[in-house]
Amino acid sequence: MNARDKKFMTAGIIIALIIAVLAPFLASPNPDGLESTAEKVMPNPETEPVLESPLPDYTLPALGDSPFGGVVSMVIGTILVLAIAYGVGAVFRGRKAAGEEGGEE
């Protein structure tokens, strides 16, 4: 990766983290269209989730509904998504390099 690409990636990560920090303060407390429609169609869901969310409703359970909990939750989520994307990219980059070494296209 050349220096220009590194600067581009660094700027993208910084922008993503800035958005993660500001998002809890800009988000509407009202439910979105899908959520409000689901509440109208099925007001009392009787099922339990198969898996509990680690960051339910973009908060950390230990911090409650505070904006700080939302900020920490968004930053953790952003870092996790970036790490997963990097890992998937590394796997495919490794496969491409292995295919080139073996003479396959």
UniProtKB/Swiss-Prot annotation:
Its main location: membrane. The lineage of its organism: Archaea, Methanobacteriati, Methanobacteriota, Methanomada group, Methanobacteria. This is Uncharacterized protein MTH_1706. Residues 32-53 are annotated as: Disordered. The chain crosses the membrane at residues 8-28, 72-92. It comes from the Archaea. One of its GO terms (cellular component) is plasma membrane. It is a multi-pass membrane protein. The keyword Kinase does not apply. The keyword Membrane applies. It is found in: Cell membrane. Pfam families: PDGLE (PF13190). Keywords: Cell membrane, Membrane, Transmembrane, Transmembrane helix. To M.jannaschii MJ1570.
